[in-house]
C-alpha cells in the first residue's frame, strides 16, 4: 500500500479577508501558521515520514510546507516547487471580496465561478498589473502557458502532466510523498484520483491546514482517504469554505 498526503496551505491573509486570491502571492496569517504547525504535529504523531515533498511557487504553500517539515524534523528532504501546483488563476476577480462580488453579480454566479468545472471568470488583460507575466518567477514560462484566467478544467490540464511525469513515479516507487498546495490545484488532483464527475467536484471543499491522507494500490487507485484530526472541526472547516461567497452564510 502506498501513501500520499495532500495539504492545503494554512489560512492566508486573503482567505481571512474573503478575497479571491489565485496567483496573488499573499502570506499566511498567524492562524494559518498555527494550522501548519498543527498539521506537522498531527503527521508526526501519526507516524508519518516523507521522502520528498512538492509545492507551488506561492509563499503561502511554501511557508506551510516549511513549517510542517520543521515540526516533523524533516526539513532536509528534497522539495520540488512548480507553478503547475499553483492555485487556479481567478482572472479579473483576483483581489475582490467574495461577498461583495456575490452582492454585485449574484450568489449563483459567484458559485459558478468558484466551483464549476469549465466556466472561467472574467479574464485579466496583459497590461493589468496583476498579470503574472510581469512576475520574475514566471519569466521562463512560454507566454501561452501564463493564464489570464482559469477554470478548474484548465487547472487539471496543467496539474495532471506534472502529476504523471514527476509525482506519480515517486509514489509508485514506494516513496512517501507530501504535496502542499492550494484548494483548487488539490481539487484537480482529488477529482482525478477519485474519478469524480463535474457535478461531484462542485460539492468538494478542501479546508485549509488539514492533512488529507490517501492510501493507494499499486496502480495508484485509492483504497481509502481520510483527513487527520478532530472530525467535528474538519467538518466545520469544510463548511467555512463552502460558505465563502454566500450573501447570508449559515455560520
UniProtKB/Swiss-Prot annotation:
GO terms for biological process: gluconeogenesis; glycolytic process. Catalyzes the interconversion of 2-phosphoglycerate and 3-phosphoglycerate. Its EC number is 5.4.2.11. It holds the Pfam family His_Phos_1. Disulfide bonds: none annotated. Pathway: Carbohydrate degradation; glycolysis; pyruvate from D-glyceraldehyde 3-phosphate: step 3/5. The lineage of its organism: Bacteria, Pseudomonadati, Pseudomonadota, Betaproteobacteria, Nitrosomonadales. Substrate binds at residues 8-15, 21-22, 60, 87-90, 98, 114-115, 183-184. The record marks 182 as: Transition state stabilizer. This is 2,3-bisphosphoglycerate-dependent phosphoglycerate mutase 2. Homodimer. The active site is at 9 (tele-phosphohistidine intermediate), 87 (proton donor/acceptor). It is an enzyme of class 5 (isomerase). Keywords: Gluconeogenesis, Glycolysis, Isomerase. Belongs to the phosphoglycerate mutase family. BPG-dependent PGAM subfamily. PROSITE patterns: PG_MUTASE. GO terms for molecular function: phosphoglycerate mutase activity. It catalyses: (2R)-2-phosphoglycerate = (2R)-3-phosphoglycerate. It comes from Nitrosospira multiformis (strain ATCC 25196 / NCIMB 11849 / C 71).
